[in-house]
């Protein structure tokens, strides 16, 4: 039977960039702002970080398809960095990867970072239904936020 991880992992710090229309800030500025706050909150040096997970969904509007920008922006060389995406749950997916790595004993301190910056890129929202969206994979009218809302409601009902 699976064993829980609640006694194996602790979140020791967190940071968040200032919310709002940040026209002057690039994605790497937002990432760095949140990272520095997290380091201060955790009272650790960045050299203590053993691995990182980087959540970004709309890569073309943000930082590209690779996880490399995270280690470049934060000056975190020589640690593994994994890029993840999972629609609206991408940030949670990054956190999940970091938590599982610590719980498994693969590292002592892991970093989870999520970043999206869409409004100043010309991005208008989910793609039109005629441009190869989820319509053929799921029921008509499916959108990721709607599906997550239904899953949340079903979970709360149980």
Segments the model singles out, each with a brief description of its role:
Residues 106-110:
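Short, high-confidence coil segments that cap the C-terminus of an alpha-helix
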Residues 1-81, 103-104, 114-158:
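Conserved "HGTGT" condensation-loop signature of ketosynthase/thiolase-family condensing enzymes
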Residues 80-88:
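A short, structured active-site edge motif that brings together acidic residues
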């Amino acid at each position: 039977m699976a064993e829980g991880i609640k006694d194996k992992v602790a979140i020791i710090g967190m940071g968040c960039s200032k919310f709002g229309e940040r026209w002057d800030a690039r994605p790497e500025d937002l990432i760095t702002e949140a990272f520095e706050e997290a380091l201060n909150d955790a009272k650790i040096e960045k050299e203590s970080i053993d691995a990182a997970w980087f959540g970004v969904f709309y890569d073309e509007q943000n930082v590209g398809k690779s996880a490399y920008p995270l280690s470049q922006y934060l000056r975190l060389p020589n640690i593994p960095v994994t890029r993840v995406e999972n629609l609206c749950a991408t940030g949670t997916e990054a956190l999940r990867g970091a938590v599982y790595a610590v719980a498994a004993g693969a590292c002592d301190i892991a970093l989870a970072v999520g970043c999206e910056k869409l409004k100043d890129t010309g991005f208008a929202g989910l793609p039109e239904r005629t441009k190869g969206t989820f319509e053929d994979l799921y029921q008509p009218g499916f959108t990721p936020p709607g599906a997550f809302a239904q899953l949340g409601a079903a979970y709360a009902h149980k």
